[in-house]
């Protein structure tokens, strides 16, 4: 199972858009891989619709979406067709038809839950590094806005070499400002509050 900072495992997979090799085929792009327990299930259907409706947001961020479950390609295609016909939403991202081996390799099988994949999310950066992992129980659908926020936060942190507070960009203390890394030396600590806004030398922040 890949952990934070690990290379995303090399996977050769079959998808509704044809064969893919991950993360090679997406090198240079951020991607969000999310697994769902099964096709033709209510919670998963609401999630697919929600992901699709946020596609413009993900595209603005340069992020590719990929779904995954242990279902056959034909099942995926029939389900996608049902979503379009009944709900009026066309699913445009690829969906992986995984097997037990692939699911086990990335930690998606939950003991005691049969062969259904768990509700997981992996955010992977352009270098193929795992940057965020989320797991949800089968009974609870994901918050897609939080996944978008997490991608924005990771990209902002990488670009500006800063940390970001709780509920960013709407933090109750410092709003949309970013937290500056701790000073590396005693001398830097002494002048930190003269150069930046903050509560103490270890808690300084700035606008981006």
From Swiss-Prot:
Claim: Oxidoreductase is one of the keywords in the record: yes
EC assignment: 1.11.1.24
Active-site feature positions: 44 (cysteine sulfenic acid (-soh) intermediate)
One cellular-component annotation, GO: cytosol
Record field: transmembrane: none
Taxonomy, superkingdom: Bacteria
InterPro entries membership: AhpC/TSA, Peroxiredoxin, Peroxiredoxin_AhpC-typ, Peroxiredoxin_C, Peroxiredoxin_TDXH, PRX_1cys, Thioredoxin-like_sf, Thioredoxin_domain
Gene Ontology molecular function, alphabetical: thioredoxin peroxidase activity
SUPFAM superfamilies found in the cross-reference section: Thioredoxin-like
Gene Ontology biological process terms, A to Z: cell redox homeostasis; cellular response to stress; hydrogen peroxide catabolic process; response to oxidative stress
Catalytic function, reaction form: a hydroperoxide + [thioredoxin]-dithiol = an alcohol + [thioredoxin]-disulfide + H2O
Annotated residues for binding of substrate: 119
Subcellular location: Cytoplasm
Keywords on record: Antioxidant, Cytoplasm, Disulfide bond, Oxidoreductase, Peroxidase, Redox-active center
Domain Thioredoxin positions: 2-156
Gene3D superfamilies named among the record's database cross-references: Antioxidant, Horf6, Chain A, domain2, Glutaredoxin
Extra remark beyond the main annotation: The active site is a conserved redox-active cysteine residue, the peroxidatic cysteine (C(P)), which makes the nucleophilic attack on the peroxide substrate. The peroxide oxidizes the C(P)-SH to cysteine sulfenic acid (C(P)-SOH), which then reacts with another cysteine residue, the resolving cysteine (C(R)), to form a disulfide bridge. The disulfide is subsequently reduced by an appropriate electron donor to complete the catalytic cycle.
Subunit (UniProt): Homodecamer. Pentamer of dimers that assemble into a ring structure.
Stated family: Belongs to the peroxiredoxin family. Prx6 subfamily.
Its biological purpose: Thiol-specific peroxidase that catalyzes the reduction of hydrogen peroxide and organic hydroperoxides to water and alcohols, respectively. Plays a role in cell protection against oxidative stress by detoxifying peroxides.
Name of the protein: Peroxiredoxin
The species this protein was found in: Treponema denticola (strain ATCC 35405 / DSM 14222 / CIP 103919 / JCM 8153 / KCTC 15104)
């Amino acid at each position: 199972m890949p952990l934070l900072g690990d290379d995303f495992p090399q996977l050769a997979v079959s998808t509704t858009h044809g064969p893919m090799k991950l993360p090679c085929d997406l090198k240079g792009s951020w991607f969000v891989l999310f697994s769902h327990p099964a096709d033709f299930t209510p919670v998963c259907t609401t999630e697919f619709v929600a992901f699709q409706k946020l596609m413009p947001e993900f595209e603005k961020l340069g992020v590719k979406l990929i779904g995954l479950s242990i279902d056959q390609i034909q099942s995926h295609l029939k389900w996608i067709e049902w979503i379009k016909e009944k709900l009026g939403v066309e699913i445009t991202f690829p969906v992986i038809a995984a097997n037990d081996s692939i699911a086990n390799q990335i930690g998606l099988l939950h003991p005691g839950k049969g062969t259904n994949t768990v509700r997981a999310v992996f955010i992977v950066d352009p270098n193929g590094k795992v940057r965020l992992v989320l797991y949800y129980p089968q009974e609870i659908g994901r918050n897609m806005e939080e996944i978008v926020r997490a991608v924005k936060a990771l990209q902002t942190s990488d670009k500006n070499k800063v940390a970001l507070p709780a509920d960013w960009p709407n933090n109750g203390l410092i709003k949309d400002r970013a937290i500056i890394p701790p000073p590396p030396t005693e001398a830097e600590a002494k002048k930190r509050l003269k150069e930046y806004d903050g509560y103490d030398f270890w808690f300084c922040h700035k606008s981006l």
